[in-house]
């Protein structure tokens, strides 16, 4: 079993019977900037805080996962009404850290001792697993990429947006700024977790921001990225066209292309064929989720192979690149030429 060295820290935040909130324990250390964003997300200070048990998002280059628990009279936590267990990690894997945070939270309810949490945390960090008699077992190796993929639901995404799913696919392929809106946090986190599976050849999670509040520090962090997939619960995001090229409104089942991005997201015959292909895949009940993802990836590879075949000019570093002149000589329709240029730029294959 491999050690889980992606783990960075573990913290406990408690809300007592008087409504006071306190960071009672952290290991090895947590920064003030991390405390600020976690405090905003878990919202323990509110009298009507979210009933969402497990939430996740990112802060700078790291991910955080929060498991919130109600405390009952039978638990070993007198005067504590609620607590949140917070994990910071280097990797994006909500399923893995939901299980781990649940095991740790159950142990804290039972014992009320941070030292017990520390023992389990160190076991996971050094051995990749921890085991308790009554509160469950965690094995990091159980959450490999294949099992994570199987638990996505691209079929549901395509059924929701039908032929317009191609806009999401193309925006991801061309590294555009995508904002996903849903008023429900639970639904937002569920839907936005599907997007990386559409681009199997690329690590979309590097530019994934599952839950962004429209506050200065989070927006400043978002704007440091030239492309991203960002989730938002605030409906006013629809007027912030400075933040997106494509807006996906989940409850309304609507996709909006910002006016400044319409030319680069113009659909070609190839796009329409892929759109129809994805709809047919979603309707075919004999296909598993993994097969749907694999079929879409094959279509993506066909596009990339077509692009590579046009890379005939040697760049400064010796790599074969695509030039505007090469595309001009092909006498392609404007929309196709424009798409290939944008794809070459996204794949770092365009010679300026």
Regions found by a protein language model. Name each.
Residues 2-352:
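Acidic, Ser/Thr/Pro/Gly-enriched alpha-helical scaffold modules and adjacent low-complexity linkers
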